[in-house]
């Protein structure tokens, strides 16, 4: 009896399985649930019209017509010239970049790895380094228009056998075809490349070296002002100056060396009286004799005070010392108080 029941059970299971197979074979045009048609795959869509994969945002960038037709007459086109439009567009670019950061930082990962491979930033005497990238481009006029890529490299270390630091800076410039960039070509056409190595010795002329035989040499004077900003930034970092908390003065020591100091250092140097720049009573007396009335003397003191302020603004150390010493010997107590109040305002309020 048990064998008979087992046989009947297996027979019924086999019968229903075949019945489902027979019913399904008649619907040849129906796609089995859970599979995806070839057309859907080619369109990148799932069966429920959802995306199979996340398309890269730059897959369908707009490619200018001038990249394909360099001779035809084109209708004039204009970007809206109101501030709100440009502000919103820059904001959209920033948001897109921040939300798809991994799509844009691959090159920086490679460059940082290259830097760290040659200069181990984990060494004990490593101080500071940076990799600064900038892309400059003007109006895209034709299929030969280019964009300029600038990469600045910097590194500094503490000397181990003597006092001081050692630093080096170089910049690489390359021109890339704008049409290739617009089409997101990995191997964009390079029209020119330049590598400049900056000497860190102020007394010497900058020397230039090339990366390979067909690299054009370029004089230091051709570097743009943005390179100067990177040098100023590196000087701030080297001197541990927080430019959000201190007013700073910048002095250009040479074409590639900038010295950054706190404003208070400038003022301390200005207001340090020595035998050479101390108050000269004879000079002051002669000046006052020319102004006999009280009104004339008052105007003279006001002029000194104005010149003193201007010398600070213009970073004129010689003029600052001269006018400060004259104020010290000519000003009344209230005017001296105004001087120090002015200095305090410069340091802590402006």
From Swiss-Prot:
Keywords: Membrane, Signal, Transmembrane, Transmembrane helix
Main localization category: membrane
Observed effect of gene inactivation: Formation of oocyst in Anopheles coluzzii mosquito midguts and development of salivary gland sporozoites are abolished. Transmission of parasites to mice following mosquito bite-back is abolished. Parasites exhibit normal development in mouse blood stages and normal gametocyte-to-ookinete transition.
Keyword Membrane part of the UniProt annotation: yes
Signal peptide: 1-24
GO cellular component: membrane
Membrane topology: Single-pass membrane protein
Transmembrane regions: 330-350
Compartmental location: Membrane
Note, other: Addition of antibodies against PIMMS43 to the infectious blood meal significantly reduces transmission of malaria parasites by A.coluzzii mosquitoes.
Biological role: Involved in ookinete evasion of the mosquito complement-like response, oocyst maturation, sporozoite development and infectivity.
Subunit annotation: Forms multimers, perhaps with an unknown protein(s).
Protein name as annotated: Ookinete surface protein PIMMS43
């Amino acid at each position: 009896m048990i064998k008979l029941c087992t046989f009947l059970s297996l027979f019924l299971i086999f019968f229903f399985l075949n019945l489902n197979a027979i019913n399904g074979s008649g619907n040849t045009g129906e796609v089995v649930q859970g599979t995806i048609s070839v057309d859907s795959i080619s369109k990148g869509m799932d069966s429920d019209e959802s995306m199979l994969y996340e398309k890269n945002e730059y897959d369908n960038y707009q490619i200018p017509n001038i990249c394909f037709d360099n001779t035809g007459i084109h209708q004039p086109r204009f970007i809206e010239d109101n501030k709100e439009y440009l502000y919103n567009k820059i904001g959209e670019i920033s948001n897109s970049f921040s939300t798809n950061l991994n799509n844009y930082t691959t090159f920086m990962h490679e460059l940082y790895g290259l830097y760290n491979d040659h200069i181990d930033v984990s060494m004990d005497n490593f101080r500071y380094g940076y990799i600064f990238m900038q892309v400059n481009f003007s109006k895209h006029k034709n299929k030969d228009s280019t964009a300029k890529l600038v990469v600045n490299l910097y590194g500094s270390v503490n000397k181990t056998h003597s006092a001081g630091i050692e630093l080096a800076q170089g910049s690489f410039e390359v021109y890339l075809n704008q049409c290739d960039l617009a089409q997101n070509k990995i191997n964009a056409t390079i029209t020119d490349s330049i590598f400049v190595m900056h000497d860190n010795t102020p007394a010497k002329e900058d020397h230039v070296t090339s990366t390979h035989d067909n690299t054009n040499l370029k004089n230091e004077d051709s570097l743009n002002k943005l390179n100067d900003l990177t040098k100023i930034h590196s000087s701030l970092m080297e001197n541990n100056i927080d430019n959000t908390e201190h007013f700073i003065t910048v002095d250009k020591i040479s074409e590639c060396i900038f010295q950054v100091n706190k404003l208070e250092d400038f003022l301390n140097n200005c207001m340090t009286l020595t035998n050479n720049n101390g108050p000269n009573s004879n000079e002051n007396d002669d000046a006052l004799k020319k102004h006999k009335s009280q009104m004339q003397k008052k105007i003279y003191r006001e002029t000194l005070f104005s010149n003193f302020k201007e010398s600070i603004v213009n970073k004129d150390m010689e003029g600052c010392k001269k006018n400060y010493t004259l104020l010290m010997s000519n000003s009344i107590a209230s005017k001296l108080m105004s001087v120090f109040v002015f200095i305090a305002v410069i340091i802590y309020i402006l």
